Amino acid sequence: MSELYDIFREHPHISTDTRDIGADSIFFALRGATFDGNRFAAEALDKGAAYAVVDDPAAVTDDRMVLVGDTLGALQELAREHRRRLAIPILAISGSNGKTTTKELVSRVLAERFEVYATRGNLNNHIGVPLTPVSYTHLRAHETDQYL
């Protein structure tokens, strides 16, 4: 994970969609029920990604491709490591109904006094949750605790 985190520190934009590739981004080739992101790794590099993280050895056609056992697991671990290095409190909201609305209300109230970071919309799933902390690349590890 340290190698992947070092790459992330140099190229902090994460993408899981080749339509969203920015210069120097890292493309994570996620798999779904009807798609395999490994098929798009070369395209991501062609579009400007600095690296592509893949989990299919057959997809490795370039030295900028990082082979991992599971791309989703690697993304989740990268997010966990990045979040661990940020000295900011976290607030979690759970329940059956109303989580997104509650999150929006709480974040707006807290934003009156604090700098607040929250998931966009309802990206509160196994993919959206790790994409949230890795988007906080402008925060330095162990800064202040004014963020929520």
Over which residues does each language-model region extend?
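N-terminal leader/targeting and accessory segments in enzymes
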Residues: 1-77, 81
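Phosphate-binding loop of NTP-binding sites
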Residues: 75-143
